[in-house]
Amino acid sequence: MNSSLQVGIGIDVGSSSARIGVYNYYNDALLEMAQEPVPYYQDSSKKSWKFWQKSTEIIKALQKCLQKLNIREYEVKSCGVSATCSLAIFERDRTSNMLIPYPNEDNVIFWMDSSAVNECQWLNMQCPQQLLDYLGGKFVPEMGVPKLKYFLDEYSHLRDKHFHIFDLHQYIAYELSRLYEWNIEGLLGRENLNGIGNDGEVSGWSSSFYKNIINLPSNVSIGTTSLVANKHISTTVVRSCIDSYASWFAVASPHLETSLFMIAGTSSCYMYGTTISDTRIPGVWGPFDTILDNRGDFSVYAAGQSCTGKLIEHLFESHPCARKILKDGADIYQVLEQTIRDIEKNNGLSIHILTKDMFFYGDYEGNRTPFADPRIKGSFIGESTDTSMLNLTYKYICILEFLSFQTKLIIDTFQNENSNIHIKELRISGSQAKNERLLSLISLVNNGVAIIKPKENVDMMGIKGAYVLAKSAKEKKQLADVITERDISNDSEKFESLAEYRLGNDSILLRKLLCVKYHIHLDMAKQQKRYHKLVDEVFQHL
């Protein structure tokens, strides 16, 4: 290694792994990449949060990656960190001033945790509607602020302790800066221009929000507030963000206002950028005003669903035929695709015609957007005692239909009559971008919308976007300028749908069927809300 080689680092901490990429600072070429597993834990019987991680395991995994990459042998110009929208909790030792995981090593409330239902109800009653409209109309349990409120109600009475609560990405960036003696100036807590925390995370809110609504105790600090900056003078610039935004930064279209980005993995998130706007879109988060620049010239809107790719994982984990395929070591997606082709050939009908009487709704972890309703759950009409390969295939198709309908609902929500948004292309990254049948369905149910994919490995977009984030800060450039001025035509490609899903090739009957099933999809959500209301009425006068 040559210590004079100047590099930038991109870090992406996802739901189950940590990845680090080292990029040539001057030509943006990926030089090396390292990856380590990072587990999350689940126990639905716990009284407190049900999903968690350990910050110690995350940092150790990242240190292993950095050691593999011999990072100290480079001249590091910048480091970008992206991580899930989880919450990290620490107690500050009064003697050493060190941060200690609290209440024990299980100190990261995982993004997937939705325990803070009561706290959401309290916040939605306390906050003015004008504020809530920036969050799609309501706080939802997976956001950072409800998780913070949950923690405060449990622990803030312990006045002999001083707590630090971080958005996970900010903590990781702070801790790595401390360990590697990088500059943390860019991580110091600042209010967003409109005083709203991006995606409901704990940083970025106005001081009046924490004082007047949350009533934040004096023994609780948010992020790096009151932490002493390292004394080392370093020119290595460090920045951090939620992982979904990093993936967007990597592949965002220069034509922001006609392009919607979708990062689709375990969950799915959507991002849309436009020139500054104060328009609130019902069911959509935003506008947020400091993500693409700090001048207030651009607004960002976001939406998301908690359980998307996880639906397929759950099917594979729970269905006996899927378990056998996985046990045998076969590629389950290839097996399913071949089975679909065989079924269609033998029946002379589209697989969707054969599943016409099966209706799946998959908000297993509640609905983030556009309904902001944690009580909505999964449902399936068409269940039987069948556990054959045919049944597995049909259920897989039903999940793909649900995911395509869900994406259509998000696009329709963005394009409501008052938003003045017109989506011409959908850019997709993440593990679901590898599923050609799913992408074909999404395009078809959205009237043939163009789907753009990265040419590079879709799993690498998080580290690339994190690198872009920090490099732009190092060069004192606005992200919006970097995105709108660059040419990424060689980095992305238009996806060609499978023949049976292309407009003009698909049968009129199939298109009519999917249209009807989309309206059934909407009705299934509506009926759940109706059932909840009927049940609630039983308890109103007790």
Swiss-Prot record:
One term of GO molecular function: D-ribulokinase activity
Biological process (GO), any one: pentose metabolic process
Domain of life: Eukaryota
GO CC aspect terms: cytoplasm; mitochondrion
UniProt xrefs under InterPro entries: ATPase_NBD (IPR043129), FGGY_C (IPR018485), FGGY_N (IPR018484)
Other information: Present with 1050 molecules/cell in log phase SD medium.
Name by which UniProt lists this protein: Protein MPA43
Native organism: Saccharomyces cerevisiae (strain ATCC 204508 / S288c)
